[in-house]
Amino acid sequence: MKRTFIMVLDSFGIGASEDAAKFGDQGSDTLGHIAEVCARGEANVGRQGPLTLPNLSRLGLGKAAEESTGTFPQGLDRNADIIGAYAHASELSSGKDTPSGHWEIAGVPVLFDWGYFSDEHNSFPQELLDKLVERANLPGYLGNCHSSGTVILDQLGEEHMKTGKPIFYTSADSVFQIACHEETFGLDRLYELCEIAREELTEGGYNIGRVIARPFLGDKPGNFQRTGNRHDLAVEPPAPTVLKKLVDEKGGEVVSIGKIADIYANVGITKKVKATGIDALFDATLIEMEKAGDNTIVFTNFVDFDSSYGHRRDVAGYAAALELFDRRLPELLKLVKDEDIIIFTADHGCDPTWPGTDHTREHIPVLVYGPKVKPGSLGHRETFADIGQTVASYFGVSPMDYGKSMF
């Protein structure tokens, strides 16, 4: 029985890529810098002391990071008994965004340039805004700028609730984000507005990767909170991913946990499981791993590392989340059976010590475990697509156009 489990620790980079300078990210290192801050005793909010990741260390995380940067992360166990194969991988795709990283993991790098709304103020074309107001019968809009999603709620949340005007904003990523209050504006109405925005962006040729619904609750600045009802409307991958090939060629199953289905525009997904928060995502993953049959991929995105800690530049929060993940890791590993493989990886970096609030162009860890996987270094992988090619080879589907199998 062949099963693969892919766990994406969203934004968990392990050192700047060779081309990081082109993105202004030379020297970024999500894991390494978190470890440094923890070792200095400067991340003792909700946790204490050096970064402690014994189970990820046994899978080779520290070794992979050392091969990436030349420096072993502070606090991790250099003498851990390595039980998995490990590597660091560079991104071939032109961007450092979520869809590019995930599509490349599944064997389809993004070699075209996404469209972006690069102006920090008055970010969106007036023609687009006018169409959204008209088609969705809106009283107007707020924002129209670059912003952190939490900051803009404190700035405009009250006005949004009073006026019914949705909050439109973007970032350095190829995104059009819409924040609305679940109760005063309505969740279904927000989703409908996002569908309209997706249509207009596609028909207008803007080449924007995602429209993201950002629902929130609360009644005043300081207590506005984004809810777990986020929804991403992505464009479809430009070629068949290994997920789609498994479904089409083998009649296989691909179980999405968290936002995976949204990222792939539901293409190559046979089951969707919604969960919010690291513990809930972990619990859902355990349930689906136990139920998984032959020719199945269970694919989970742990988004909180990125959305709650990376973008918010919260080192202590990121460290605590990593330590929580690590504590629960044995629960996953004990469900891995004879022919199974489980892969722990990331889709980009988001160094919480880095200037700004955006992603960072970094190597990702590739940690592979299974009873038949030989422990040791798999070296430097030139593309995330090596993961997809490895999975394609494992299941015996037609090869991907990019990447080399790691085994």
Swiss-Prot record:
> In which pathway does this enzyme or protein participate?
Carbohydrate degradation; 2-deoxy-D-ribose 1-phosphate degradation; D-glyceraldehyde 3-phosphate and acetaldehyde from 2-deoxy-alpha-D-ribose 1-phosphate: step 1/2
Residues bound to Mn(2+) 1: D10, D347, H348
Q: How is the cofactor bound?
A: Binds 2 manganese ions.
User: Gene3D superfamilies under this entry?
Assistant: Alkaline Phosphatase, subunit A (3.40.720.10), Phosphopentomutase (3.30.70.1250)
Reactions that this protein is recorded to catalyse: 2-deoxy-alpha-D-ribose 1-phosphate = 2-deoxy-D-ribose 5-phosphate; alpha-D-ribose 1-phosphate = D-ribose 5-phosphate
> Which EC number(s) are documented for this chain?
5.4.2.7
User: Where does it mainly reside?
Assistant: cytoplasm
Q: Which cofactors must be present for this protein to function?
A: Mn(2+)
Top-level enzyme category:
isomerase
Cellular component per GO, a single term? cytosol
Q: Where in or outside the cell?
A: Cytoplasm
The positions annotated for binding Mn(2+) 2 are D306, H311, H359
What keywords sit in the KW lines? Answer: Cytoplasm, Isomerase, Manganese, Metal-binding
Q: What Gene Ontology terms for biological process does this UniProt record contain?
A: 2-deoxyribose 1-phosphate catabolic process; 5-phosphoribose 1-diphosphate biosynthetic process; metabolic compound salvage; nucleotide metabolic process
Q: Which domain of life is it from?
A: Bacteria
Which molecular-function annotations from GO does this UniProt entry contain?
Answer: magnesium ion binding; manganese ion binding; phosphopentomutase activity
Summarizing the function annotation, the protein's role is: Isomerase that catalyzes the conversion of deoxy-ribose 1-phosphate (dRib-1-P) and ribose 1-phosphate (Rib-1-P) to deoxy-ribose 5-phosphate (dRib-5-P) and ribose 5-phosphate (Rib-5-P), respectively.
Record-stated family: Belongs to the phosphopentomutase family.
Q: What is this protein called?
A: Phosphopentomutase
